[in-house]
Amino acid sequence: MGLTLTLTDADLPASPAFIEFLHATLTGEAYHAGSWYQQEEESLASNEGRFENIQEKAHAVVADPKGKEHLLRSYRFFKELLTGNVHTLRDLARFRFFFVIGIPRTGGTYLTKQLFRAGGINYTTVQNALAHDGFPHLARLSFKEQGNVHTNGLLQLAEYLTMVEVFFGEHGRLAYRGGIIVPKKFTKAVYYFDLLRELFEANADYLVTLRHPLSTCRSVLDKSGGMPADGKFAVRSTIERWTLEDWLHWGVGEEQLRQMDYVECFLGYWKRFHFQMAMAGIPSMPGTRLVPYGAESMSGAAKKLYTEFGLKMEPEAFKTAEPPRFSGDQERAAQQAVEEVAGFWRSLGLAFPTEALAAKL
């Protein structure tokens, strides 16, 4: 037709985390790892003040020929994600992705760390955006203050894939089934799994972490400041914000949500997350492994991976928590949520490990 559509970086600017990564790569500075690998602090990390000088770093990245090349590479990936005409994205076939998928506080951080150890990479030095949840921010479609969440999410995915090329192209040493191992904790993969499946086809494995909703809820509370005094839902941490977003998607207003019982609110999020996981087809993928929460299960899964990789090493110890204490009504509500998820999975021909989760409650 002869039409030309123009989008500039003013319309779709590079993400601060991506600029930060490129700047550290070019200058040799330490990556911003934050505390993603510390289970006790997970989900409480703050970015306040982190990107204050991001404009200076952006100018430095653009002024560097290599930095500009990486930026252009990310936008090229983005264009292919938008159009579906995949060419340069095929270069990613040299990587073997290990996506660790599960609702937060289910042991995914532990498995991600053990995968980095397998590759001989010190996980405390890996930028949090490269290793952990939150980036890319793939979420349900909405138009927010920052624009189209879907489009921005695709750009961040393109940036993440560029980061993979840069970081693992230099530091990746361990190969498995023809590809360099790339670990990624990716909670939000449940919302965009079709995209991952299209991109990586047979070049990905999925470690699905599962945990009883009450022990998960207790862990979220412990990392978010404890149960609110009135027992009502509150947003103080990243995980609680994701819980809020889930309910908003289902048509429940924020004011109404803040009047809901905290446990009831979290159970709704937990239940729908696992419904979505099943509907996405994640549990039925050939490369999927279900890993119930617990020291024996988690360390056993890591040990099995090491054996498959041909490594003679032991996984780190897995930290467990004391059994949670909730009221009888809350326990019954949680049991109903588990039964509903198990029944839904069963209707799709999938087996939900109910007994394994109850044993580690």
Residue ranges and their predicted role:
Residues 132-136, 216-220, 323-324:
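Short, charged, surface-exposed secondary-structure boundary motifs
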